Amino acid sequence: KNGYQISISPTLSYRLIYQTPEVGLFNKCDFWMRSDSVIVINIRGTIGKTESWLENFYSAMIPATGKLQLNDSTLFNYKLAERSNAYVHVGWTIGMAHLVPFIVKQLNELYKTGHKEVIIFGHSQGGAIAYLTRSYLEYLPETQLPKDIVFKTYCSAAPKPGNLYYAYEFDFVTRGGWAFRVVNSADWVPETPLTVQTLDDMNEVNPVVDYKSSTQSMPWLVRMYVNSAYKKMDKTANKGVKYYQKYLGNTVFKQVQKTL
């Protein structure tokens, strides 16, 4: 009508080929095969279960490389970044840790039939787990996953899965347009979890970190004022970290532990 197309028919179709069981804190993902043979991993977001929301609130930070004791019998080794100062959200790392054994197994099976192009997608909580899953797959040795699989990642309305140094690492791994984060600027989810920045989080070359040296040439009165102000701000930030660890770390951990 008037030269415009009334409806658009999809040029590609998708077929569900595998679903993981619900694991961890009600985490789940699907494997779809696109009509052009590209594999799409769709990671589910938060659902209306207390355990699923606990995963979001369990937002203490852990090193991006380490071990997680998932339960009495399962120790999960993971590497999500090269940087020692990269940290990630513990709740979503737990979700990722429960899903990736199924994901890796399916990818290896699909690889045997020639499928080497994979899209990783997740919305909301699923978007955060999609970030971490992509990072995990990047650092798996070739004995566990072939290195010529091509991944592209789409994170829709995803919250922040790690700190700034994890973000730097993820950006480098997916450089060249191999990852996209799609957000609505008015959405509150990408603003979470709450973050607290201290002097310890900054690069050593930042003059703010070594503010005492930076103020040596200032007049005595100015130097005393700056030192006093910095100490108060740093003390407030560190106090915020302690509350964060207490309520969004230790307290939530007790509830998560009961579930797992």
Q: Model-predicted segments: where are they?
A:
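Short glycine-/acidic-enriched loop or helix-start segments at secondary-structure transitions
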Residues: 52, 130, 165
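Active-site signature of alpha/beta-hydrolase-fold catalytic machinery across serine-
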Residues: 132-136
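A conserved cap/lid and substrate-binding interface adjacent to the catalytic center
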Residues: 12, 17-118, 143-145, 150, ...
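Active-site-proximal beta-strand/loop segments in catalytic clefts of secreted hydrolases
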Residues: 42-46, 123-124, 156-158, 184-185
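Gly/Ala-rich beta-loop-alpha elbow adjacent to hydrolase catalytic centers
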Residues: 122-126, 130
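Charged, compositionally biased non-catalytic regions
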Residues: 1-7
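Short, glycine/acidic-rich beta->alpha junctions
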Residues: 23-24, 129, 162, 174
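Serine hydrolase/lipase
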Residues: 101-117, 139-260
